[in-house]
Structures are given as C-alpha cells and as structure tokens.
Curated annotation (Swiss-Prot):
Domain of life: Eukaryota
Positions where Phosphoserine occurs in the chain: S66, S135
Name recorded for this polypeptide: Zinc finger CCHC domain-containing protein 17
S1 motif domain sequence ranges: 1-40
Assembly, per entry: May interact with PNN. May associate with the 60 S ribosomal subunit.
UniProt organism field: Macaca fascicularis (Crab-eating macaque)
Length: 193
C-alpha cells in the first residue's frame, strides 16, 4: 500500500476506489486459495509495473524472515568435559586448550536454568555461616593496638603538660611542620618504588 507503515488504510484508499495491484503470491490453505496483492510496486496513475523482476518483493520477504523469533532454539554445547582447567580454574576444558592470559579476565559457562533451580533449592536447606576474612581481622587488631599505644604515650606526656587532665592536640607549629615534611618524604619514596 505504501513504502512506509500505514496505521489506517482509510487515509490512503477508500472503499470502492479503483486501484492498480500486482499479484505477488498464491497459496492453498484448507481448500481455499490465498492471494497476495501489492499496490507498492505498481504506478497508480498508469498501472505500470515498477518491479518487473520482483527484486523489491524478495528483499521485503528476506526482511520479514530475519525478524522471526529464535528464542525456542537453544544453543547447546555438545562436548563439555567434566574437568577443571589448571590455568584458570574454570570447568569444561584442559589447560592445553585454555586461552586465558595471566592476569586476564576469567569466563565460565553459564549453568542451565534447571541447574540454577536445583542450586537455589539446596541453598535454602543449607545456609552456611558467613566467615569473615582473617586478614581484615588482623588489620583491625593492629589498628586498635596502635590506637592504644598512642593513647598511652599521649596520656603520659599530657599529664605533665596540662593541669586540667585534657591533652593538647597540637603542642606547637614546629612539630606540625616537621610531620608534614616527613609525610611528603614518605609519599615521594612510595612513588619512586
């Protein structure tokens, strides 16, 4: 009818109007003949066929075929090995067939929906107790020790400095400048290494 999509055919053609059409297809369905007609490939003024070799019609058919739904077709891997790779730690291939580069991104196969459901069910029955990272615990303990050491050394020196019991945060500007210099030196050393 038109080269672009038409929502209301009544905008272009009214019932009873005479139009030029081209027969583009004929099918038998349930003892009936289905006839496909096209107004696009015929000049409506003269009735001349604009697509005598049916090139435009074939292109449209190809476009329609490409939009078919392929969700029912599942990609299946035929031979998945029941092994674990020594290089990357992923299942399904040997180390000699592994393409992973050292320090590269690791990829593994996505489990089927059925396997995910089974894993979810087993996870509901068995809820493991979360274990904390031991390195985090060590870091926290070291931090607490340093904090305690600072408090004890500060409290010793602050008793002699102030009579009210409160310790002074910054005793002098000279010590503050010295700390900044030390920090800068440490910072520079880190970048050089």
């Amino acid at each position: 009818m038109s080269s672009c999509r038409v929502d209301k055919p009544s905008e272009i053609v009214d019932v009873g109007d005479k139009v030029w059409v081209k027969l583009i297809g004929r099918e038998m369905k349930n003892d009936r003949i289905k006839v496909s007609l096209s107004m696009k490939v015929v000049n409506q003024g003269t009735g001349k066929d604009l697509d005598p070799n049916n090139v435009i019609i074939e292109q449209e058919e190809r476009r329609r075929r490409s939009f078919q739904d392929y969700t029912g077709q599942k990609i299946t891997l035929e031979a998945v090995l029941n092994t674990t790779c020594k290089k990357c730690g992923c299942k399904g291939h040997f180390a000699k067939d592994c393409f992973m580069q050292p320090g590269g991104t690791k990829y593994s196969l996505i489990p089927d929906e059925e396997e995910e459901k089974e894993e979810a069910k087993s996870a509901e029955f068995e809820k493991p107790v979360p274990t904390r990272n031991p390195s985090r615990k060590r870091k926290k303990e070291k931090k607490k020790k340093k904090h305690r050491d600072r408090k004890s050394s500060d409290s010793d020196s602050s008793d002699s400095e102030s009579d009210t019991g409160k310790r002074a945060r910054h005793t002098s500007k000279d010590s503050k400048a010295a700390k900044k210099k030390k920090k800068k030196k440490k910072h520079k050393k880190k970048h050089k290494e």
